[in-house]
Amino acid sequence: MSTEPEASAQPLPAQQSAALFRLMTWLSPAFPVGAFSYSSGIEWAVEAGDVEGAASLRDWLDAMLQHGAGFCDAVLLCYAYRATERHDDASLLAVAELAAAFVTSAERQLETLSQGRAFIEIARKAWNSDGLGRAVAACGEAIAYPVAVGVVSASHGVSLPATLHGFLHAVTSNWISAGARLIPLGQTDSQRVLAALEPAVIATGSRALAASLDDLGTATFRADLASLRHETQYTRLFRS
């Protein structure tokens, strides 16, 4: 075995390495946006018996990704990213206001706005830039989580496709984490669910990149109802 480095093993360019480092940091479970305290209605779905194990959790999340909040948030992220990249303050404000309103319940609004606010605050303290400050100001007071991720990534030159797929992976992982604590599921079963959802994450990201705001909408009535009913659920671990 040779101890000499292979010529084909070239390092990533510095700019790509920095972008990857930042994206992995921002979308890591360790990034303090409080995602662990939200279940997006999954807690009620478990209580009601709609989600009982790994298979039903996978099916529930597949629908949320492709036909529910996952797809809608992905589209909103894309529009926020592009508006930031173009320095189009009017469009950025419009998409920020739409994202803050385009939620199915008061708890879902709390979830997305709280995480968005935390994401912006930490990102600005650790990776601030003049462009980021300008974009944040253009968004107005309410910044939903997907808008926050799009704005920060665009301001730092992280590519939109990478940002989008990283965001969907992070959201899906958090949903699975909530389900694992509630059902409960073991670590191996949780990873099997995540692996099974890989095609849905990829497909949702691809659709969102090509979607218009007219494509926003959900076909996940039961999941939307779960988010509403969670507001009056008697015993709860999660805020949504």
Curated annotation (Swiss-Prot):
GO terms for cellular component: cytoplasm. Keywords: Chaperone, Cytoplasm, Nickel insertion. Required for maturation of urease via the functional incorporation of the urease nickel metallocenter. The keyword Cytoplasm applies. It comes from the Bacteria. Coiled coil: none annotated. UreD, UreF and UreG form a complex that acts as a GTP-hydrolysis-dependent molecular chaperone, activating the urease apoprotein by helping to assemble the nickel containing metallocenter of UreC. The UreE protein probably delivers the nickel. Pfam families: UreF. The lineage of its organism: Bacteria, Pseudomonadati, Pseudomonadota, Alphaproteobacteria, Hyphomicrobiales. Belongs to the UreF family. This is Urease accessory protein UreF. GO terms for molecular function: nickel cation binding. It is found in: Cytoplasm. It comes from Rhodopseudomonas palustris (strain ATCC BAA-98 / CGA009). The gene is ureF. Gene3D superfamilies: Urease accessory protein UreF (1.10.4190.10).
